[in-house]
């Protein structure tokens, strides 16, 4: 639960106007892969949680959303794609380079954009992997303002392989944002 997405509302005052801003803190891109693979409808995931938080914030009539990815070291690539679909109507989210050098777009969205209001994404030097993919997609599609320091710069896709006494992690691809190479 410490890694689960959380929301709060803040009020920002400007001369002659105040703004209600929803802040979603996302410490990790998580997904219950076991429940998902068993086709359990109510599996836990960051994209499902953020979708519910966005619905609540829309009902609360916020003027904009801040998505806080500071300290988020990444997680599920599938969740980065699923979360991007909530904000970006269509287009590829990221490109991956295979070991043979071929580049393939991943995460082509064709879904309904759940939130189309103003968005700001906060990043820092600890924002890595899936965080960088999401922030890069927002940058590519000019979907929101990216604020903070340079991110970690991971740029690789990894896969876990189960062994009889643990797991081994393989780096199998490099990732690039879609419109500009990292």
Locate the predicted segments by residue.
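Conserved small/polar residues in nucleotide/adenosyl-binding loops
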Residues: 181-182
């Amino acid at each position: 639960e410490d890694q689960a997405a959380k929301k709060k509302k803040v009020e920002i005052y400007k001369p002659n106007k105040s703004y209600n801003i929803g802040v979603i803190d996302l410490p990790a891109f998580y997904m219950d892969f076991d429940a998902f693979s068993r086709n359990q409808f109510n599996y836990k995931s960051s994209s499902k949680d953020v979708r519910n938080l966005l619905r609540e914030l829309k009902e609360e009539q916020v003027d904009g959303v801040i998505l806080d990815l500071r300290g988020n070291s990444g997680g599920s690539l599938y969740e980065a794609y699923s979360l991007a679909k909530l904000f970006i109507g269509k287009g590829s989210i990221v490109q991956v380079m295979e070991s043979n050098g071929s580049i393939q777009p991943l995460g082509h969205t064709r879904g309904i954009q759940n939130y189309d209001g103003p968005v700001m994404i906060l990043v820092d030097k600890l924002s890595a992997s899936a965080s960088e993919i999401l922030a890069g997609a927002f940058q590519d599609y000019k979907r929101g303002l990216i604020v903070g320091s340079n991110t970690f710069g991971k740029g690789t896709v990894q896969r876990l392989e189960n062994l009889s006494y643990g797991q081994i992690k393989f780096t199998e691809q490099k990732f690039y944002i879609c419109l500009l190479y990292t």
